[in-house]
Amino acid sequence: MVEATLSDKLNRLRQRRSGPLILELDLTEGIAEEPPSDVLSAVLAMRRPRLADVLDGLRRARADDKVNSLVVKIGGRRIGLARVQELHAAITEFRRSGKATVAWGETFGEFSPGNAAYYLATAFDRIWLQPSGDVGLTGLSLEQWFYRGALDKLGLEYEVGKRYEYKNAADRLTEQGFTGPAREALEQLASSLTGQLTAAVAERLAVPPAKARELIDNGPYVAEEALELRLVDALGYRDEVYDEVRKSAGPGAHLLYLGRYHRSRSLAERERWYRPR
């Protein structure tokens, strides 16, 4: 009986070494730009992957024959648009290498806009959504607070330098609303971001940009509506998502967090680099 148990364990270990590798990533706690600078920040950021590690891990995994697929949980804490764009590009390149990609989320923007989360999801082959979730496509708007009136009421004085009309960072302190150039710059930014989201939705659904823009403007959508409109591919819970991913990967498939994969590959490369010849 003991021998049989040991034999089973050894067989499972062999399968883990030779079976397909499924990388997983959880982005619901956000993503970190740089390593934490102090102990408290490090503790608070323990569940937040570093952007550089994610990008480098995906780059390594593209060329790794052992890696079969990638499954990512999206939603929760918001990620900045610039980071989302980098992640979208990296996942698109990973997918184009021939490996399967699956995104899933409990919701994409429940009670808040989910444009960035859904834009990231469009980089994947398949999108799963929890049956109680939403796809928060709401169109894009940008806003800015101005403090000139409050500072005047408080009697606070300040000195601000400003060189050009489009350098408008100081406008929050010096103006009570948008200047012409500042409004123009912000409108161009909003138009560019909306164009990227529209193009991503149009490409994924294989529809004209005008139809994609209509879908964005008419949101948000509950899960059943999103499925009917093909904004998501399936409704289900985590266990159903992973069952499909494992079945698609084949016998012996096993999971590994992308962060651990990145660290192990980096360590292996350093060992080869410094190994005496």
PLM regions and their residue ranges:
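Residue-level recognition of oxygen-bearing side chains
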Residues: 146, 221, 240
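Secondary-structure end/capping motifs
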Residues: 201-215
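A glycine-rich, coil/turn loop motif that links secondary-structure elements
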Residues: 110-112, 214-217
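A ligand-binding cleft/hinge motif common to bilobed small-molecule-binding domains
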Residues: 239-247
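Small-residue-centered hinge/linker elements
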Residues: 1-205, 246-277
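Short acidic-hydrophobic, aromatic-tinged amphipathic segments that line or gate anion-handling sites
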Residues: 128-129, 232-238
